C-alpha cells in the first residue's frame, strides 16, 4: 500500500469519527431539550444545523473513493464549522452581555422557516431565548463548548489536509 492510500484511509477514519461525534452532540442537545426541558434558541438551532452539515459532509467524504472528493468534502466540513463558529461565537457574546438580544424576533421566523423545522420540529424549531442561562457543564456554558468544538473542527480538518497532502522529499 502506498503512503497516499494510508493517508487517505486515515482521513476517512477521522471523518467518520467526526461525523459520529457531531451526531452525538446533536443527540445530547435533543436530550437536554426533551428530557431536561432546556428550550433551544435561534442560535442553538443554527449550531445544530452546522453540526448536521459537518456530519453529512464528513460521512460523504468518508464514502468518497478519490482524494479530490475527500478534499472537497473536508472543505465543506470546514466551511460548516466556520458557520458554527459564527453562531456559537454570537451566542457566547450574548451570554456574556445579557442586555443584548439574540434577535429572536428577527431570527425565529427565518430559522423556523427552514425545511427541517417543519420535518422535525422537536429538534429544529425555536422555543427559547438566547439569554436564558443554563447550568454550566464542567465550568463552561453549552455555547462555549459548542464554540470550542467548532474551532477544533475548523483547525484540525485543514491541518489534516495539509499534513497528509505534503509530499515527503
From Swiss-Prot:
The keyword Glycoprotein does not apply. Disulfide bonds join 41-44, 102-130. Residues 32-49, 90-144 are periplasmic. Keywords: Cell inner membrane, Cell membrane, Chaperone, Disulfide bond, Electron transport, Membrane, Oxidoreductase, Redox-active center, Transmembrane, Transmembrane helix, Transport. One of its GO terms (molecular function) is protein-disulfide reductase activity. The keyword Cell membrane applies. It is found in: Cell inner membrane. GO terms for cellular component: plasma membrane. The chain crosses the membrane at residues 15-31, 50-64, 72-89, 145-163. It is a multi-pass membrane protein. Pfam families: DsbB. GO terms for biological process: protein folding. Residues 1-14, 65-71, 164-169 are cytoplasmic. Belongs to the DsbB family. NCBIfam families: PRK02110.1. Required for disulfide bond formation in some periplasmic proteins. Acts by oxidizing the DsbA protein. This is Disulfide bond formation protein B 1. It comes from Pseudomonas savastanoi pv. phaseolicola (strain 1448A / Race 6) (Pseudomonas syringae pv. phaseolicola (strain 1448A / Race 6)). The gene is dsbB1.
